[in-house]
A protein has these predicted regions:
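PLP-dependent enzyme catalytic core of the Aspartate aminotransferase-like
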Residues: 342-346, 351-504
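Conserved N-terminal alpha-helix of the aminotransferase class I/II PLP-enzyme fold
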Residues: 46-92
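Conserved small-domain helix->loop->beta segment predominantly found in fold-type I
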Residues: 282-360, 364, 387-411
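Generic beta-strand/beta-sheet core signal
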Residues: 111, 132, 167, 195, ...
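Short acidic (Asp/Glu) and glycine-rich catalytic loops that position anionic groups and cofactors
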Residues: 246-250, 268-277, 318-323, 353-359, ...
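A generic structural motif
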Residues: 170, 275, 331-332, 365-369
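N-terminal "arm"/small-domain region of PLP-dependent enzymes with the aminotransferase-like
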Residues: 1-65, 447-449
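Conserved PLP-enzyme active-site core in the AAT-like
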Residues: 8-9, 13, 17-21, 40-41, ...
Length: 504
C-alpha cells in the first residue's frame, strides 16, 4: 500500500473544499456559531473539519471507505492483520482487549502494575484477575515488567487462566522479554495481550525495543498521542493471528466508540501513521540522539542519576526505551514530587510525572534542543539549591525514607471477591485509617503513574493503609476514591452496617 497517502484526512479536506452548506452537527457549524475567543484561538481550519459522519465521510463504527483504508494502512505500517482507530485512548483499548479475549468468569493473568484502565476492564467484563508480581527496583522505587519465568510459574499454578496480559513498556521505559513471554503463552495456545501504550514508536526505529506485534502479541494497544504526532485521546489497537476472533473483536470495539466521534482526532491518527511510515526513522534518530546526549549531561550533575543501558539485563528490564529519561533526585535530599514542583515553579519546566525518588522527562519527535537545554539547566540549578526536605511537601515524614534510599512497596492484598462483584455490591463509607480488614469497593490509584494500589474485592491491609497515608503526606493525588482526600474509603457493607461520615 502507498504509505504516503492519508485517505481520511483527504476526504475531510475535500468536503471543506466543496463548499457544502452544513445543516448537520456539530452545532457550531464549522466555527460560525462558536464564541469568538475560542474560535480565534483554535483557528478556522481545525473547526472546518470538525464534522459528523455524513455520507462520504465514512463511519468509525462501521468503516467501509476512507476510514477502512486508513486502518488498513495502519495495520501494514505496524505489521498487524487488523488495526483499529480509537478515540478514548489506550484506556478503551485495554478494556476492549479483555472483553474480546475472555468470557465473564474466566481468569486472566496480569501484572500488579497494570494501568487502572485494566481494572476497569475487569469490572466491565466480569473477568477474574490472577495477579503476577512484576520485578521491583526498591532503590529506584519503581516496578518493572514481569519475566517469562513469572508467567510460566503463574500458568503452572493456575492452569485455568484463559489469557495473559502484560505491560511493556512501563511508564519509565523498561520493556519485557515479549518474545520469551509469547513462547510461554502460545505453547498453551492462549492469547497474549500487551499494553504497549508507551511504545507506539518502537516499530519505526531499529535502536528501539522490539514492538509487541513483532514479538508475537495477539493484541496490542498503542497510545499514539503519547509519543507520536496525533492528538490527545487517540490510540490504535492492533490484532494479529487467529487466537482472537475478528468478528467478536470488531463488535467489542463498537461498544467503546462514540457514535459522534471527533473526526479531527480520527484524521490525526491517519496523518500520524503516514508521518511515521515515511519519516519515522529519521525523526526518531534525532530524538534518540537528543535523549541520549541529555541523559549524559544530566548524569554529569552531582547528585543526579539517570539510568540507561546500565539497567538492561536486570530483572524486569529486558530492554529500555532511551526516549524516557528518569531523573533520580534522592541523593539531593528531595522527593521527586518536590523536584518536579521546583522545576515547574522556578524554571518553567514540566516533567511527565514524579514519584518519591524520581521525575520522568519524555523525549518525543517534538522535543527540541532548546527544550533539552532548559531541562538540563533547571536540574543543574536544582542540584545547587540548599532547601529543607519539606520545601513543597506538607510534611517532612519522608526524610527517613530518603535517607535510607529505599521504599518498600505494599504486597498484593488478598482477594476476597471478584472486582465486578465488589464494585457493584452494597457499600458503606468507613474511616480510611481504620479500614484494615475490610473489603475494598473502589479503586485507589496514586496518580501518576496510575497504577492501582488496592482494587475492588481486595482486603485492605495495614501495610496498604500505611503506604497510602505516606503517599498522601507526600502530596500525591489519589484517583478513584469517592473521597478524593482519602479520609474515608468505600468498602463492601457488612451485616452490622454503619456508615462513617467524615467531619467537615
Amino acid at each position: 500500500m502507498d504509505q504516503t497517502r492519508t485517505p481520511y484526512f483527504d476526504v475531510l479536506l475535500d468536503y471543506v473544499d466543496s463548499g457544502v452548506i452544513p445543516f448537520h452537527t456539530p452545532g457550531h457549524m464549522q466555527g460560525r456559531g462558536m464564541d469568538r475567543s475560542l474560535r480565534d484561538f483554535l483557528g478556522d481550519n481545525v473547526l472546518a473539519i470538525d464534522l459528523t459522519q455524513i455520507r462520504g465521510l465514512d463511519d468509525l463504527l462501521q468503516p467501509e471507505e476512507a476510514i477502512e483504508e486508513a486502518q488498513q494502512l495502519a495495520a501494514e505500517a505496524y505489521g498487524a492483520d487488523n488495526s483499529f482507530f480509537l478515540i478514548n485512548g489506550s484506556t478503551s483499548g485495554n478494556q476492549i482487549m479483555m472483553m474480546a479475549a475472555l468470557n465473564p468468569g474466566e481468569k486472566i493473568a496480569l501484572p500488579r502494575n497494570s494501568h487502572k484502565s485494566a481494572m476497569g476492564g475487569l469490572i466491565m467484563s466480569g473477568v477474574a484477575p490472577v495477579w503476577m508480581k512484576p520485578e521491583v527496583d526498591v532503590g529506584l522505587h519503581m516496578d518493572h515488567t514481569v519475566t517469562p519465568q513469572t508467567v510460566r510459574a503463574t500458568l503452572d499454578e493456575h492452569p485455568d487462566v484463559r489469557a495473559v496480559y502484560v505491560v511493556s513498556p512501563t511508564y519509565y521505559g523498561a520493556t519485557a522479554d515479549l518474545e520469551g513471554i509469547a513462547a510461554v503463552v502460545h505453547e498453551r495456545d492462549l492469547p497474549l495481550l500487551v499494553d504497549e501504550a508507551w511504545g507506539p514508536h518502537f516499530r519505526f526505529h531499529p535502536a528501539l525495543p522490539i514492538d509487541a506485534i513483532a514479538a508475537g502479541a495477539d493484541l496490542s494497544i498503542n497510545s499514539t498521542h503519547k509519543m507520536l504526532g496525533s492528538l490527545s485521546q487517540t490510540a490504535m489497537l492492533h490484532h494479529k493471528g487467529e487466537r482472537i476472533r475478528v468478528d467478536r473483536l470488531k463488535s467489542v470495539v463498537k461498544l467503546f466508540l462514540s457514535t459522534s466521534p471527533n473526526l479531527v482526532l480520527v484524521a490525526s491518527l491517519d496523518v500520524a501513521r503516514k508521518q511515521m511510515a515515511t519519516e519515522g526513522a529519521a525523526l526518531l534518530s534525532r530524538t534518540i540522539e537528543l535523549a541520549n546526549d541529555t541523559r549524559r549531561r544530566l548524569n554529569e550533575i552531582p547528585g543526579i542519576y539517570c539510568f540507561g543501558d546500565d539497567q538492561v539485563g536486570r530483572p524486569g528490564v529486558f530492554d529500555l526505551d532511551p526516549t524516557k529519561i528518569t531523573i533520580t533526585v534522592k541523593a539531593l535530599g528531595y522527593t521527586g514530587y518536590e523536584a518536579e514542583e521546583i522545576l515547574r515553579r522556578r524554571y518553567n519546566v514540566q516533567c511527565e510525572l514524579a514519584d518519591l525518588f524520581n521525575c520522568l522527562a519524555l523525549f518525543t519527535i517534538g522535543t527540541t534542543q532548546d527544550s533539552a537545554d532548559r531541562l538540563v539547566y533547571g536540574v543543574k540549578e536544582l542540584s545547587r539549591e540548599d532547601r529543607p526536605i519539606d520545601v513543597f511537601s506538607p510534611s517532612g515524614v519522608l526524610e527517613r525514607r530518603l535517607q535510607t534510599g529505599t521504599y518498600n512497596l505494599p504486597a498484593i492484598p488478598p482477594m476476597r471477591m471478584k472486582p465486578r462483584e465488589a464494585f457493584l455490591a452494597d457499600t458503606e463509607l468507613v474511616r480510611f485509617k481504620g479500614s484494615a480488614g475490610r473489603i475494598c469497593a473502589e479503586v485507589i490509584t496514586p496518580y501518576p503513574p496510575g497504577i492501582p494500589v488496592i482494587s475492588p474485592g481486595e482486603e485492605i491491609t495495614p501495610e496498604i493503609v500505611d503506604y497510602l497515608e505516606l503517599e498522601k503526606k507526600a502530596g500525591v493525588r489519589m484517583q478513584g476514591p469517592y473521597d478524593s482526600e482519602l479520609r474515608s474509603i468505600r468498602v463492601v457493607r457488612e451485616p452490622h452496617g454503619g456508615i462513617w461520615i467524615p467531619q467537615t
